[in-house]
Amino acid sequence: MAFLDNPTIILAHIRQSHVTSDDTGMCEMVLIDHDVDLEKTHPPSVPGDSGSEVQGSSGETQGYIYAQSVDITSSWDFGIRRRSNTAQRLERLRKERQNQIKCKNIQWKERNSKQSAQELKSLFEKKSLKEKPPSSGKQSILSVRLEQCPLQLNNPFNEYSKFDGKGHVGTTATKKIDVYLPLHSSQDRLLPMTVVTMASARVQDLIGLICWQYTSEGREPKLNDNVSAYCLHIAEDDGEVDTDFPPLDSNEPIHKFGFSTLALVEKYSSPGLTSKESLFVRINAAHGFSLIQVDNTKVTMKEILLKALKRRKGSQKISGPQYRLEKQSEPNIGVDLESTLESQNAWEFCLVRENSSRADGVFEEDSQIDIATVQDMLSSHHYKSFKVSMIHRLRFTTDVQLGISGDKVEIDPVTNQKASTKFWIKQKPISIDCDLLCACDLAEEKSPSHAVFKLTYLSSHDYKHLYFESDAATVSEIVLKVNYILESRASTARADYFAQKQRKLNRRTSFSFQKEKKSGQQ
């Protein structure tokens, strides 16, 4: 037993003992900061002291220098000790035993007996491979199907079949489109071809899918193998191609467009459709006339009648009274609807209700068509803008941009930077559909530099009037252009407006007649 009174030596001895015996490390954690306290209690010696003092304290500080154990670190992980070499060796032996279990040792033994060359040859005997004669048995169902569908193998548009969405309805976004084919004959072009495409397909992919389905169904005539030779145009419900708008961009996705009816047109014939604009048939009716565009003279009179009725009734279903076509020069003689336009030798017809007749002089005042007038009528549907002044009742006139086309009339205010709108009401833009237009009349013409015209339209079951002023030439052109548009469209609002106007006129005439009658009796 040893008696020690030096705390530094005692602390070093305790730490060395716990390094080999304490697995928890708690004693090291408790005694780790004790050296700091000892350093405070034993300050370093001041230079200049005697050598005896240094030698006297060297024995005491020797234990203090080695008091800190090499296995104890003053850090956040002081409670975690490294594994001993024995534990690491035992772990390595355990893993080696597990690996030995997975391995299988096979002892190699050489044979003393030698095999002959004949025995070795019999082990790998060469077999004779004879070609089997072709069996003349029954054909498989796959072979029969391939022979029955030769067009499927020779379809040059097979790469676009992956965009067919008929098998993906309900699981993937698809789009159903009715496609008219103007290159068909007159009978087949009336019925569209329904195509179901993937919503992620582009317009170019849709064109290829249409060509693939067209070829797979064995339709005639055959298409060009190059998909780039075709384009998609907007089409009406009856298959008429709307050439006022350009074709769809082939690089755009098809879901970007909301049209459910399209037409497949050849690119070289798409701009050439203007050559067909000279073929127009005039259909006279009770409240005006309509110009029906036809592709050629082989069209039947039944198709012309259907187009005239649709132009007259708009988007409504063709129902109600039945109509027939008569030549303008031959009243009360119906035209055979199965005959072609070429066999009629006429370009002007009259639309008459069944079980009715027309007088010989009906529509004769408009029977003679001037070529210049027809050209003005056709160009009246093209968009053109005019700068005019809009007249208000309780405030000054405002400058507006009046845009007129065959579909609508747009009134956009012209912003003037110099004019202050702080104390005046700002003019709002107005858009009027041509089906709601009723009349356009010249109100007054004071001088060649000043004229006023009135525009009447239907708004929420009420007729509203707008007044504009400009020079006489501009006003005359606007009135003529709008009236050409109104005459070429069978508008219900326009017919009701004139009927109401006629009733008011009859009521005034009847009232004035009764007033004159009473004054005569007195």
Curated annotation (Swiss-Prot):
GO molecular function, a single term: phosphatidic acid binding
Q: In its keyword annotation, does this UniProt entry include Ubl conjugation? A: no
Superkingdom of source? Eukaryota
Q: Which residues carry this modification: Phosphothreonine?
A: 86, 398
- Where do the SIN1-type PH domain residues begin and end? 382-487
Share the record's PTM remark. Answer: Phosphorylation at Ser-128 by PKC promotes relocalization to the perinuclear region, where the mTORC2 complex specifically mediates phosphorylation of SGK1. Phosphorylated at Thr-86 by AKT1 or RPS6KB1 in the presence of growth factors; the effect of this phosphorylation is however unclear. According to two studies, phosphorylation at Thr-86 by AKT1 is part of a positive feedback loop that increases mTORC2 activation. According to another study, phosphorylation at Thr-86 and Thr-398 by RPS6KB1 promotes dissociation from the mTORC2 complex, leading to inhibit mTORC2 signaling.
> Region Interaction with NBN: what ranges?
2-267
Q: Quick one: which residues bind a 1,2-diacyl-sn-glycero-3-phospho-(1D-myo-inositol-3,4,5-trisphosphate)?
A: 393, 428, 464
Q: Where is this region: Disordered?
A: 38-59
Keyword Transcription regulation set for record: no
Residues forming the CRIM domain are: 139-267
Activity regulation, free text: Phosphatidylinositol 3,4,5-trisphosphate (PI(3,4,5)P3) promotes MTOR activation by relieving MAPKAP1/SIN1-mediated inhibition of MTOR that takes place in absence of PI(3,4,5)P3.
Modification N-acetylalanine, positions = 2
**Cellular location(s):** Cell membrane; Endoplasmic reticulum membrane; Early endosome membrane; Late endosome membrane
Identify the keywords attached in UniProt to this record, alphabetized. Answer: Acetylation, Cell membrane, Cytoplasm, Endoplasmic reticulum, Endosome, Golgi apparatus, Lysosome, Membrane, Mitochondrion, Mitochondrion outer membrane, Nucleus, Phosphoprotein, Stress response
Alphabetized CDD domains for the sequence? PH_Avo1
Q: Where is this region: SIN1-type RBD?
A: 279-353
GO biological process entries: cellular response to insulin stimulus; negative regulation of Ras protein signal transduction; regulation of cellular response to oxidative stress; TORC2 signaling
Carrying Phosphoserine, the residues are 128, 186, 315, 356, 510
Q: Where in this protein does the record put region Interaction with ATF2?
A: 468-522
This molecule's function is given as:
Component of the mechanistic target of rapamycin complex 2 (mTORC2), which transduces signals from growth factors to pathways involved in proliferation, cytoskeletal organization, lipogenesis and anabolic output. In response to growth factors, mTORC2 phosphorylates and activates AGC protein kinase family members, including AKT (AKT1, AKT2 and AKT3), PKC (PRKCA, PRKCB and PRKCE) and SGK1. In contrast to mTORC1, mTORC2 is nutrient-insensitive.
Q: What is known of its domains?
A: The CRIM domain forms a ubiquitin-like fold with a characteristic acidic loop, which recognizes and binds AGC protein kinase family members substrates.
- What protein is this chain from? Target of rapamycin complex 2 subunit MAPKAP1
Lineage of the organism: Eukaryota, Metazoa, Chordata, Craniata, Vertebrata
Q: Which gene encodes it?
A: Mapkap1
